[in-house]
Curated annotation (Swiss-Prot):
Species classification: Archaea, Thermoproteota, Thermoprotei, Desulfurococcales, Pyrodictiaceae
Origin species: Hyperthermus butylicus (strain DSM 5456 / JCM 9403 / PLM1-5)
Matches recorded under SUPFAM superfamilies: ATP-dependent DNA ligase DNA-binding domain, DNA ligase/mRNA capping enzyme, catalytic domain, Nucleic acid-binding proteins
Record keywords, A-Z: ATP-binding, Cell cycle, Cell division, DNA damage, DNA recombination, DNA repair, DNA replication, GTP-binding, Ligase, Magnesium, Manganese, Metal-binding, Nucleotide-binding
Name the record gives this protein: DNA ligase
HAMAP family per record: DNA_ligase (MF_00407)
Residues annotated as binding ATP: E266, R273, R288, E318, F358, R435, K441
């Protein structure tokens, strides 16, 4: 069975007009009920704004604004200049294409012409979801000599056949600017309602998605085989598992108490988290954001081939840059410098790496994610053949807060960021895709009153003054609220940027600039331009404070006030983190409460 693409385009238009998550959920439920089970995966990918999961490492569409305008020019029989002028006026290529196409339709109707572009203004066309998807996939996959002309011809054909509304969303999809404001959590809930019988089944959908990070595939299994099939899903080598995340505390006594009185405490390395998969001689390496980064680490591939003794395995670790002269750890930025190099092999000796392993999730057909940490660690020790650059993370088991503190100081002295404390009781499972109190990170910034850095998402930008006039000079930052699947404003940051950072800002933000407040953004402060929540930055500040204008934790501490950061300062970009990996509103609330307790203790009178 097929489904008209117009059904999808109409839903996109509805989603674009609303900001309330409950209304978005209703529209998705309505759409999924109309969708044939055989194509639900393609519909989910379209909503996510992608053709396939990032981790598959398949080519992207490879079409920039210029090629899109050229294709539209061919399809609409108008000059590229005419389209460019309208794009400049509207700031939206998709809207410009829709407007021109609608005007041409109306003119044709007025003179009674029946051309191939004549479609009812409501948006009916002969396009199906499958045809649009398959054509876009062909555009992405075509390579080699003459590929540009083939891409152009295929895209022009799609735009010519599409209705005005369909053309708008095809153009936006191609540009990577679909921006429906729908998060994965809302998609999963809608799938649970339609195919699982109720929203309560979302936990089953989420568990499957966490183990097989392909929401389209999960949706298709659910729609064609039912909820029980999802319950039986296990990890698969070559398909990334969504990583388990940690909470944060900065008091060893509290950490030990929270973890049940005893914990495994490991170095927290300043590197890139990696999930390494092995099947025979085949190795995959996935980033924290589930991108396939295997090609960036040929040295790690060789380490894994030699160092994992199991035939099939999924292990987790941290890739850390090492000084070739001293063997000491080098900062995260050095690793990112290596990743930006086109010829990675040329810098292998200049920027060598070591891998520190801390978990194993799957071995020879056995799913270990529901096993307690000690059992997983025991398997890790059995299957890993250690060397100087491939070894298990430094760690101790302790129930003593003082021993934890001493180990933390040793970690800092050795060049680590801090430590990660982990529960080792019977319930210490691997919570794929979730942040919880089974893992707690403990790191400290000695130069600041604020006890830790935070990872915030860019939701807006402000133009600078003076020599920065006309260019971006400050950013509006937000925390993630998983309960509402929204981003709440925390602070405006304009300090800490190097000249190089500022020069790159305009180009970095350009693909994500929005002409209106994004649907998932909750902010009273209005920036000069809105930015789709995509980019993550590490921020430090003097202290957490209350603010009447920021929406993070609004009303949680005091009526009419949210939590903000006083004197925020940019530290670095976090390309390894997605927006949903950012510091959460609950984390900031807990940090604020701990700060208050610390201040009260410091101000308390001593002696008599």
């Amino acid at each position: 069975m097929s489904m008209p693409f117009s059904v999808l385009a109409e839903t996109f238009e509805k989603l674009e007009r609303v900001t309330a998550r409950t209304q978005m959920l209703l529209y998705l439920v309505e759409l999924f009920k109309k969708t044939p089970p055989e194509i639900i995966d393609k519909v989910v990918y379209f909503i996510q704004g992608k053709l396939w999961p990032d981790w598959k490492g398949l080519p992207e569409l490879g079409i920039g604004e210029k090629m899109l305008i050229k294709a539209a020019s061919i399809a609409l029989h108008v000059s590229e200049k005419q389209i460019e002028q309208l794009v400049k006026k509207l700031g939206d290529t998709g809207k410009a294409i829709e407007m021109i196409k609608r005007e041409k339709q109306q003119k044709q109707k007025a003179v009674g012409l029946l051309a191939f572009m004549q479609k009812p203004s409501g948006g009916e066309s002969t396009l199906t979801v499958e045809k649009v998807y398959d054509t876009l996939a062909r555009i992405a996959l075509v390579q080699g000599e003459g590929s540009r002309d083939i891409k152009l011809k295929l895209l022009a054909g799609l735009l010519a056949e599409a209705s005005p509304r369909e053309a708008k969303y095809i153009a936006r999809f191609v540009e990577g600017r679909l921006r429906l404001g729908v998060g994965d959590a809302t998609i999963m809930e809608a799938l649970a309602v339609v195919y699982g019988g109720s929203a309560a089944m979302r936990s089953v959908v989420e568990r499957a998605y966490n183990l097989r990070a392909d929401l389209g595939m999960v949706a298709k299994i659910l729609a064609t085989q039912g909820i029980d099939a999802l319950k039986n899903i296990k990890p698969e080598v070559g398909v990334p598992i969504r990583p388990m995340l940690a909470e944060r505390l900065n008091d060893p006594v509290e950490i030990i108490k929270k973890l049940g009185g005893r914990a495994l405490v490991e170095y927290k390395y300043d590197g890139e988290r990696a999930q390494i998969h092995k099947k025979g001689d085949k190795i995959w390496i996935f980033s924290r954001r589930l991108e396939n980064i295997t090609h960036m680490y040929p040295d790690v591939v060789e380490m894994a081939k030699k160092g994992i003794k199991a035939e099939e395995a999924i292990v987790e670790g941290e890739i850390v840059a090492i000084d070739p002269e001293t063997g000491e750890f080098r900062p995260f930025q050095v690793l990112m410098h290596r990743r930006r190099k086109k010829d990675v092999h040329a810098v292998l000796s200049e920027i060598p790496v070591a891998v520190f392993l801390f978990d194993t999730l799957y071995v020879n057909g056995e799913d270990l994610t529901l096993k307690p940490l000690p059992a997983r660690h025991e398997v890790l020790e059995k299957i890993i053949e250690q060397s100087d650059t491939w070894r298990i993370a430094e760690g101790i088991v302790t129930s003593d807060p003082q021993e934890l503190e001493s180990f933390f100081l040793k970690a800092i002295e050795d060049g680590a960021e801090g430590v990660m404390a982990k529960a080792i009781h019977d319930r210490s499972i691997y919570q794929a895709g979730a942040r919880g109190w089974l893992w707690i990170k403990y790191k400290r910034d000695y130069k600041s009153e604020m006890s830790d850095t935070v990872d915030l998402v860019v939701i807006g930008a402000f133009y600078g003054k003076g020599r920065r006039g006309g260019k971006f000079g400050a950013l509006l930052m937000a925390a993630y609220d998983p309960d509402t699947d929204t981003f709440k404003s925390v602070c405006k940051v304009g300090s800490g940027f190097t000249d190089e950072d500022l020069e790159r800002l305009d180009d970095m933000l350009k693909p994500y600039i929005s002409d209106k407040k994004p649907a998932r953004v909750d902010s009273q402060m209005k920036p000069d331009v809105w930015v789709e929540p995509t980019l993550v930055a590490e921020i430090i500040g003097a202290e957490l404070t209350l603010s009447p204008i920021h929406t993070c934790c609004y009303g949680w501490v005091k009526s009419g006030a949210g939590i903000s950061i006083r004197f925020p300062r940019f530290i670095r970009w976090r390309p390894d983190k997605g927006p949903e990996d950012a510091t959460t509103t609950k984390e900031l609330y807990e940090m604020y409460k701990r700060q208050l307790r610390r201040i009260k203790e410091e101000e308390a009178p001593t002696g008599v």
